[in-house]
Amino acid sequence: MFIFFINTPTPPNIFFSKNIKIKKLMRFSCTEVCIFFSLIFFFFFFFFCVNWGCENNLLSRKYQMNRDTCNF
């Protein structure tokens, strides 16, 4: 009886609940995640340009941006 209890598989409800949680986490596709992170990167770059101004920003010096484009 004890050996039979050890050999019984775990109840399927545990597996189903884990699969539902994983499906809820994976509802976004890879392209949506990539677009989301690229938008975040773009907004951080824009915020850095606006905050520091052109004379302090090495990237804006490299691309020769005007002061009007960085400081609003």
Swiss-Prot record:
Predominant cellular place of this UniProt entry's protein: membrane
Membrane association type: Single-pass membrane protein
One GO CC term on file: membrane
Entry's localization field: Membrane
The organism's place on the tree of life at top rank: Eukaryota
Transmembrane feature ranges: 33-53
UniProt keyword terms in alphabetical order: Membrane, Transmembrane, Transmembrane helix
Descriptive protein name: Putative uncharacterized protein DDB_G0292940
Organism: Dictyostelium discoideum (Social amoeba)
